[in-house]
């Protein structure tokens, strides 16, 4: 039995969960999310607890057991608390400006880089070099933050670029001068 998959998921007050065959719908104060459960995995709702089970010990169902449980737990956390990733911009002249719900970055290129906020994601500028990506879908928040970071990855020599707020950049030693 999977160590993670066998743990029951408690459904907090104010969250409504519906299990309809392979479709799990979670509705909470911040919004609604759905997940399609893969074939061998079964989800059961008893009062205010969800249990994820697998019919056999085949490799495919073992690997999906813990994953499915974690994905459902992430849905519940998303609709109650939400997810947020903070990013920092380091470098001379590097900055971010809010243009409505979109962002405009100055990252040392010959042109400003515009980023549109996808549906369900909130982009907030907290200063000229700080921004946050927030939403209820953990995967989407992480993907948008990674795409913003990819615009100018942190340089290993000078440390310039866009990084996560808690990220530590491993610096390389430059060539030795004479």
Curated annotation (Swiss-Prot):
Gene Ontology cellular-component annotations: cytosolic large ribosomal subunit
PROSITE patterns linked to this entry: RIBOSOMAL_L6_1
Keywords: Ribonucleoprotein, Ribosomal protein, RNA-binding, rRNA-binding
GO molecular function list: rRNA binding; structural constituent of ribosome
One Pfam family recorded for the sequence: Ribosomal_L6
The keyword Ribosomal protein is assigned to this record: yes
Gene3D superfamilies hit by this protein: Ribosomal protein L6, alpha-beta domain
GO BP field: cytoplasmic translation
Annotated InterPro entries: Ribosomal_uL6-like, Ribosomal_uL6-like_a/b-dom_sf, Ribosomal_uL6_a/b-dom, Ribosomal_uL6_bac-type, Ribosomal_uL6_CS
Family classification: Belongs to the universal ribosomal protein uL6 family.
Reported function: This protein binds to the 23S rRNA, and is important in its secondary structure. It is located near the subunit interface in the base of the L7/L12 stalk, and near the tRNA binding site of the peptidyltransferase center.
Subunit structure: Part of the 50S ribosomal subunit.
Name under which the protein is recorded: Large ribosomal subunit protein uL6
Source species: Renibacterium salmoninarum (strain ATCC 33209 / DSM 20767 / JCM 11484 / NBRC 15589 / NCIMB 2235)
